[in-house]
């Protein structure tokens, strides 16, 4: 978990979110962003998908956590940014978004969470 002060506000980012919807509600009530890695694509990730389902569109982030937490199509292999589209597509499908909407929403969220371009 990461928290930092920006413009007199505290930004909370739950990295590699791997908990259930109950904890997600608590985090979201405090303004947290939930960041999902490739593990959300695993068959066993039901609780993570429940958390994704309740998160507001503008509080969802995506990450690789490379070289670990590789998405399902390549599970067990070395992870990297080149596999991020698998996770983005999975999140898009879960949210009912097309790929363009997912890319735009997740990009906008990253700018909001991290304060703009790096």
Task: Kindly label every feature range from the protein language model.
Residues 1-12:
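Single conserved hydrophobic/aromatic residue that forms the stacking wall/gate
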Residues 9, 23-37, 56-59:
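Glycine-enriched alpha-helix->loop->beta-strand junction motifs that scaffold or abut catalytic
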Residues 13-15, 35, 61-63:
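Structural detector of well-ordered beta-strand residues that form the stable sheet scaffold
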Residues 15, 27, 52, 65, ...:
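Conserved, mostly hydrophobic/aromatic
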Residues 16, 32, 39-40, 66-67:
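Active-site metal-binding loops of divalent metal-dependent hydrolases
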Residues 35-50:
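Active-site glycine- and acidic-residue-rich loops that bind
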Residues 58-80:
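Short acidic/histidine-rich active-site segments
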Residues 82-118:
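Mid-to-C-terminal alpha-helical segments outside catalytic/metal-binding sites
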